[in-house]
């Protein structure tokens, strides 16, 4: 590390990294930091950096820049922390990628399907990062893996409160992440699987079915396999949901991060042909507070409407109550004795409940279903996009929405989320 200079009033620091080390830094609140690779080669979560190009990271970003052979880096701006570490599990992650690539080559040779990998672990162990890494390494070798997002709290394929899949055709952008051109997205409606575990498992199965259908007609997708990101709920129903996902996708490999107990439980409960691997989390992984998670969710939703760093201009328009049908998936829990004969609480969890538009809808997100009619089973139909209700005029029977596309709405079936978004910026 070299001395700091105050170029353009921003502190600038140079770092000389030895082979197989990484620079870790976190960006201060309300600040941004620029990173530049001056010499050598380096990567961020499997995406190679271009030399002499400045990459900008905004407030709250937590970044690890790794080098296999050594490099020179320059940071400009105020960081909360910035240090070089030799203690990194990257070699273990690379070995995992190499083993998966061998499975893909074997699948090509024997005309079988490629590896289906599920990454599991408690919260804040770096599951999303490992997924990104494995996907980037695969696509850099010419593969076309599918990224499956089962973490409803994060929504990296779409927005929080959804589950989805994305066909990866190029490495993730250093700043923006994976290019989200045509994701397959399903409405869940909450940031916690426990709010409706029956629906969560049903959508997991639906995603697996659609992925299998794609693999039947797309040989490259089949050989490349998939990488499945999961949520950090690993006990009780959360654990059962992991076992269900492994079964639905017929996974070949489960990567367990940082929890020996979970590793042993899965080894015991999954079929013997599933390879279960225990890997350490990176020392750079930091614990995220509830406030930070909420801010990240809000930022993700804001990005959906306004684009990365505000490059889009969303549309505001009125929607008549009579033009749409709004539903919530899952009826409130009632005592078993009050349920109709032959009906269980589980049936109740998948029930479509009509929602009458009212002022309590303000700030709620609505998923625009691709369904043509309710007989299509709205809970298992993908969504075209999302709108947020900004105001409701009960007297004139209209509500105003913020939408990424101009009027009219593509379909008239809407599913309401528990998630709210207040457009304050």
Curated annotation (Swiss-Prot):
SUPFAM superfamilies for this protein: P-loop containing nucleoside triphosphate hydrolases
Cellular localization per UniProt: Nucleus
Main location per the UniProt record: nucleus
Entry EC no(s): 2.7.1.78
Protein name, entry field: Polyribonucleotide 5'-hydroxyl-kinase Clp1
Family (UniProt): Belongs to the Clp1 family. Clp1 subfamily.
Catalytic activity: a 5'-end dephospho-2'-deoxyribonucleoside-DNA + ATP = a 5'-end 5'-phospho-2'-deoxyribonucleoside-DNA + ADP + H(+); a 5'-end dephospho-ribonucleoside-RNA + ATP = a 5'-end 5'-phospho-ribonucleoside-RNA + ADP + H(+)
Cofactor: Mg(2+); Mn(2+); Ni(2+)
Function as written in the Swiss-Prot or TrEMBL entry: Polynucleotide kinase that can phosphorylate the 5'-hydroxyl groups of double-stranded RNA (dsRNA), single-stranded RNA (ssRNA), double-stranded DNA (dsDNA) and double-stranded DNA:RNA hybrids. dsRNA is phosphorylated more efficiently than dsDNA, and the RNA component of a DNA:RNA hybrid is phosphorylated more efficiently than the DNA component. Plays a key role in both tRNA splicing and mRNA 3'-end formation.
Gene3D superfamilies membership: Clp1, DNA binding domain, P-loop containing nucleotide triphosphate hydrolases, Pre-mRNA cleavage complex subunit Clp1, C-terminal domain
Cellular component aspect of the GO annotation: cytosol; mRNA cleavage factor complex; nucleoplasm; tRNA-intron endonuclease complex
Domain of life the protein comes from: Eukaryota
Cited CDD domains: SIMIBI
Organism of this sequence: Mus musculus
Species lineage: Eukaryota, Metazoa, Chordata, Craniata, Vertebrata
Gene inactivation effect: Early embryonic lethality.
Family annotation (PANTHER family): CLEAVAGE/POLYADENYLATION FACTOR IA SUBUNIT CLP1P, POLYRIBONUCLEOTIDE 5'-HYDROXYL-KINASE CLP1
Broad enzyme group: transferase
Gene name of the record: Clp1
Known partners and oligomeric status: Component of the tRNA splicing endonuclease complex, composed of CLP1, TSEN2, TSEN15, TSEN34 and TSEN54. Component of pre-mRNA cleavage complex II (CF-II). Also associates with numerous components of the pre-mRNA cleavage complex I (CF-I/CFIm), including NUDT21, CPSF2, CPSF3, CPSF6 and CPSF7. Interacts with CSTF2 and SYMPK.
Gene Ontology MF terms: ATP binding; ATP-dependent polydeoxyribonucleotide 5'-hydroxyl-kinase activity; ATP-dependent polyribonucleotide 5'-hydroxyl-kinase activity
């Amino acid at each position: 590390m070299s001395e700091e200079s105050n170029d353009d009033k921003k502190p600038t620091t140079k770092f000389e990294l030895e082979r197989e080390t990484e620079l870790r830094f976190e960006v201060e609140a309300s600040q941004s930091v620029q990173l530049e690779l001056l010499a050598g080669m380096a990567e961020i979560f499997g995406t190679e950096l271009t030399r002499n190009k400045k990459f900008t990271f905004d407030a709250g970003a937590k970044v690890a820049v790794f080098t296999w052979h050594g490099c020179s880096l320059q940071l400009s701006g105020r960081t909360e922390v910035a240090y070089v570490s030799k203690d990194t599990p990257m070699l273990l992650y690379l070995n995992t990628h190499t083993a998966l690539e061998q499975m893909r080559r074997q699948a090509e040779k024997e005309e079988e399907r490629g590896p289906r990998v599920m990454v599991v672990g408690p919260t804040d162990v770096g599951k999303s990062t490992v997924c990104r890494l494995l996907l980037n390494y695969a696509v850099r070798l010419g593969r076309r893996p599918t990224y499956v997002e089962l973490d409803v709290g994060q929504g990296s394929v779409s927005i929080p409160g959804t589950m989805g899949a994305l066909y990866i055709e190029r490495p993730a952008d250093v700043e923006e992440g994976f290019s989200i051109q045509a994701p397959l997205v399903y409405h869940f409606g909450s940031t916690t699987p426990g709010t409706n575990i029956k629906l969560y498992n049903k959508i997991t199965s639906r995603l697996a079915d659609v992925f299998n259908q794609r693999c039947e007609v797309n040989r490259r997708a089949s050989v490349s396999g998939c990488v499945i990101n999961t949520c950090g709920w690993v006990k009780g129903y959360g654990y059962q949901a992991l076992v269900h996902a492994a079964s639905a996708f017929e996974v070949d490999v489960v990567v367990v991060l940082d929890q020996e107990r979970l590793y042993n439980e899965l080894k015991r409960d999954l079929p013997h042909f599933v390879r279960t691997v225990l890997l350490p989390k990176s020392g750079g992984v930091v614990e995220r507070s509830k406030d930070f998670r909420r801010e990240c969710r809000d930022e993700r939703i804001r990005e959906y409407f306004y684009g990365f760093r505000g490059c889009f201009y969303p549309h505001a328009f009125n929607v008549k109550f009579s033009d749409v049908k709004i539903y919530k998936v899952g009826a409130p829990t009632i005592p078993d004795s009050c349920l109709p004969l032959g009906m269980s609480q589980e049936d109740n969890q998948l029930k479509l409940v009509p929602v009458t538009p009212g002022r309590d809808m303000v700030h709620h997100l609505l998923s625009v279903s691709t369904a043509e009619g309710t007989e299509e089973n709205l809970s298992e139909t993908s969504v075209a996009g999302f709108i947020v209700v900004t105001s409701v005029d009960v007297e004139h029977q209209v509500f105003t929405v913020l939408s990424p596309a101009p009027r009219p709405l593509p379909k008239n079936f809407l599913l309401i989320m528990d998630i709210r978004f207040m457009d304050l910026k």
